[in-house]
Amino acid sequence: MNSVQVRIADWQQDNAELRRIREAVFIAEQAVPPEQEWDADDAEAVHFLALEGGYPIGTARLLADGQIGRVAVLRDWRGMNVGDALMHAVIAEAERRG
């Protein structure tokens, strides 16, 4: 595995990848109803994508109140510190925003 890169994502521009990951993890694996997975917070949240070799493998979001949520890593990349990389990036951004 190459090093995982985490970047801030754009909800509009990166929507397909963000949705693909969350649908795989929350809707398909965890049986979260779609109407509960997608909410109005998505449009306003700061989203993050974890990428390995340029391929999106994980996501998370940061709400305006500082709440971290929707942390998801695709099954094949679990146990490889992708979640750690996401959380470090989200926390750093939350601290930067105050």
Question: Predicted regions span which residues?
Answer:
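Short, basic and Ser/Thr-rich N-terminal targeting/leader segments
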Residues: 44, 55-56, 98
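A short, internal acetyl-CoA/4′-phosphopantetheine-binding micro-motif in the GNAT/acyltransferase core
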Residues: 71-78, 94
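Short amphipathic alpha-helix that is part of the acyltransferase structural core
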Residues: 1-37, 55
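Conserved acetyl-CoA-binding loop-helix of GNAT-fold acetyltransferases
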Residues: 79-92
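Conserved GNAT acetyl-CoA-binding A-motif
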Residues: 92-98
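Short loop/turn motifs at secondary-structure junctions and domain boundaries
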Residues: 38-43
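Conserved beta-strand in the GNAT
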Residues: 49, 54-72
